Amino acid sequence: MDIILATSSPRRINLLKMLNIKFKTVAPRIKENINETDPEKLVKKLSKLKALSIKEKGIIISADTIVYHNNKVLGKPKNLDNAFNMLKELSSKWHTVYTGVTIIEKDDIITFCEKTMVKFKKLSDELIRYYISTSKPLDKAGAYGIQELGAILVEKIEGDYYNVVGLPISRIWDILWDRRII
C-alpha cells in the first residue's frame, strides 16, 4: 500500500526521505482556523483534519506544528513586522514546539503529539532584522527554521530536534515499523 505524506512542506518531505521509504505527497486542503486554546489538542485536531482531507487510498501521514509561548500560539507570521515581533518575544526565553501527527492505515487512525522545548539566546533588534532579511520567516511557525539560519537564534533544545523542524521522524518510524508498514 502506498504511503502518502499529506503536506506541501519541503521540510517535512525532506525529513520523511531520511527514513529511506518510498512515499508520495499530496497537499491537504483544510482551513486551519480551529477554535482550540490547548496547543496539544490543536495540533492533533489539525493533523487529523489534514489526513482525513486526503481522498487517495494508502497509508496517510500528516502533521501540524506550532510554537507556543506565554499561553498563546505563534503560528506562521502574517508579515515581516509580525515575524520581528514574534522573534523579539522569544528572545532569551523558553518556548514549546508542538507537532501533532496523524497516521491513517485503513480504518485505524493514530494521532499523537510530540513536544520539544527550545530556548532562544538574547536577540538584538539588529540580529532579528538580519535574520528576517536573509531567511524566509513567513512560512514557518514562530517565524524561524531551526534547520537553517534559525539555528543562530537557539541557545538550547530539550527533546526531539526533528520535531522542531516539523516531523518527529523517530516516533513515526517506530509506529510504521511496529505495524509492519516498513
UniProtKB/Swiss-Prot annotation:
It is found in: Cytoplasm. The keyword Cytoplasm applies. Its EC number is 3.6.1.9. Keywords: Cytoplasm, Hydrolase, Nucleotide metabolism. It holds the Pfam family Maf. It catalyses: dTTP + H2O = dTMP + diphosphate + H(+); UTP + H2O = UMP + diphosphate + H(+). One of its GO terms (molecular function) is dTTP diphosphatase activity. Belongs to the Maf family. YhdE subfamily. NCBIfam families: maf. This is dTTP/UTP pyrophosphatase. It comes from Thermosipho melanesiensis (strain DSM 12029 / CIP 104789 / BI429).
